[in-house]
Curated annotation (Swiss-Prot):
The record's note on its domains: Has the structural arrangement of an alpha-helix connected to a beta-sheet by disulfide bonds (CSalpha/beta).
Protein name according to UniProt: Potassium channel toxin alpha-KTx 4.7
Site, as annotated: Basic residue of the functional dyad: K49
Listed GO CC annotations: extracellular region
Disulfide bonds: C29-C50, C35-C55, C39-C57
Species, as recorded: Tityus stigmurus (Brazilian scorpion)
Function recorded in the entry: Potently blocks Kv1.1/KCNA1 (85%), Kv1.2/KCNA2 (91%), Kv1.3/KCNA3 (89%), Kv1.6/KCNA6 (94%), and Shaker (97%).
Length: 59
């Protein structure tokens, strides 16, 4: 049972870290297709989407 609690605590601590590789760029958008060329220009890869009016790119 102690091992379970230890693993649970480790899992909680690891989940609190921000491990995402997403990059918000300061480009306004109304749809995800508008972000693709902007992400290609900013990070070199055309992978992104529009969230809350801003482009979010994924390397």
């Amino acid at each position: 049972m102690k091992a379970f609690y230890g693993i649970l605590i480790i899992f909680i601590l690891i989940s609190m870290l921000d491990l995402s590789q997403q990059v918000f760029i300061n480009a306004k958008c109304r749809g995800s297709p508008e972000c693709l060329p902007k992400c290609k220009e900013a990070i070199g890869k055309a992978a992104g989407k529009c969230m809350n009016g801003k482009c979010k790119c994924y390397p």
